[in-house]
Amino acid sequence: MFLSFCGKVPRNEGAAFVAPNATVQGDVILKAGSTVWYGAVLRGDDGQLIIGENSNVQDNAVLHCDVGGAVTLGRNVTVGHSALVHGCTVGDGSLIGMHATLLNHCVVGKNCIIGAGALVPEGMVIPDGSVAVGVPAKVIKQVSPRSEEHTS
């Protein structure tokens, strides 16, 4: 469902799929080939959300930001089931695991894997090609070439 908020209207810039019970509200841009699955909530009421080409936001995930903030997902990003992505940037080809939480101003580099249930604290920077897990998240290794094939 697409909802306007204070004059801000979501934009579908190229055949993005949005499940019937997903909510996309306010200043949200869905790039070509992106998908938003069942129960997901994308709230662009306080800042802009950009969902990159061929990225997917899976069931029950929530994307939001504080006033003046933004959420930017690069191309080919996967946001896992029930993840919370709040006011941050995720680089191309990265995977955000199920139930992971990304807080304000954190940056996840390109081709990263954030483990299921991980908490990426406010302002943390995860370098390109990293695997980060835990609460709080810690980088434990670099993505293997085989894993990188699946994230890019």
Where are these regions (language model features)?
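Glycine-rich hexapeptide-repeat left-handed beta-helix
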Residues: 1-12, 17, 39, 45-53, ...
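Compact, Lys/Arg-rich rRNA/RNP-binding cores from ribosome-related proteins
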Residues: 22
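Short Gly/aromatic-enriched secondary-structure transition segments
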Residues: 33-34, 51
